[in-house]
């Protein structure tokens, strides 16, 4: 059995998650990706030529049983787990004073509970490989924005990353928070268009994720904030 490293990525069928998966597969690693849309996952796999090292798993990052099942399926398929990337997330793009609360619960569960569930489900496997946890946050988790509930969820992810690091470092497990600025991804689909100014690509963020993941043993890169030039906040 090959001993190529194995990574599980939530929300891996498009955007940053898909770009990370491509980079890792190109490097000879094995990858499992989860997503809610089976068609999107199938299309992503087909786009890559249905590689043997890719496992696609339909499921919600915010459902405990489905996250546990994804970890178990990854271990069954590949026999190990070296890294998890908590990438699934979205924004309702509204405000606490004027927004529609109907969408807030799902956003908070996906963006905040989702990473915590992934950590809990995978930690035993990561202890065995002295692996890594990568949380995809946002600069919105460092900068206050009026009324921004999405930003509040990313502040929570910023805190979760450091709190997790302080617990799991004793077991040789690394934790990295990747906090992108404006990125050209499906994140903006619900806003009617891309924001003004320069944007990063999903591939550029993926390069930062893979760089953090592939640090030498014993090196733990904890926080990486990546903005496009010209983004002031």
Q: Which functions belong to the PLM regions below?
A:
Residues 119-120, 162:
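A short, exposed helix-loop element centered on a Lys and neighboring polar residues
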Residues 39, 58-70, 101:
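The beta1-alpha1 cofactor-binding region of Rossmann-like NAD(H)/NADP(H)-dependent oxidoreductases
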Residues 138:
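Residue(s) in the substrate-gating loop at a strand-loop-helix junction
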Residues 119, 153-154:
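Active-site helix of classical SDR
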Residues 13-15:
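Conserved glycine-rich cofactor-binding loop
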Residues 170-173, 177-178, 194-233:
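C-terminal helical subdomain
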Residues 95-96, 100-105:
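Substrate-binding pocket helix/loop in short-chain dehydrogenase/reductase
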């Amino acid at each position: 059995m090959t001993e190529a490293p194995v990574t599980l990525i939530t929300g891996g069928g498009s955007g940053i998650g898909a770009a990370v998966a491509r980079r890792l597969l190109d490097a000879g690693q094995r990858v499992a990706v989860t997503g809610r849309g089976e068609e999107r996952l199938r299309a992503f796999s087909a786009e890559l030529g249905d590689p043997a090292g890719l496992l696609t798993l339909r499921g919600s990052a915010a459902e405990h049983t489905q996250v546990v099942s994804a970890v178990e399926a990854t271990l069954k398929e590949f026999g190990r787990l070296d890294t998890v990337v908590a990438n699934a997330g979205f924004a309702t793009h509204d405000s606490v004073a004027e927004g529609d609360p109907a969408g807030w619960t799902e956003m908070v569960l996906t963006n905040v509970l989702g990473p915590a569930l992934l950590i809990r489900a995978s930690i035993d496997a990561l202890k065995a490989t002295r692996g890594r946890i990568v949380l995809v946050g946002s600069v919105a988790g460092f900068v206050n924005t009026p009324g921004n509930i999405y930003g509040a969820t990313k502040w929570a992810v910023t805190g979760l990353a450091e709190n997790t690091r302080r617990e799991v470092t004793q077991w040789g497990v690394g934790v990295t928070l990747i906090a992108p600025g404006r990125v050209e991804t499906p994140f903006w689909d619900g806003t009617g268009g891309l924001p003004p100014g320069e944007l990063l690509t999903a591939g550029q963020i993926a390069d930062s994720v893979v760089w953090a993941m592939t640090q030498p043993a014993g090196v733990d890169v904890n926080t990486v904030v990546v903005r496009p030039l010209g983004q002031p906040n």
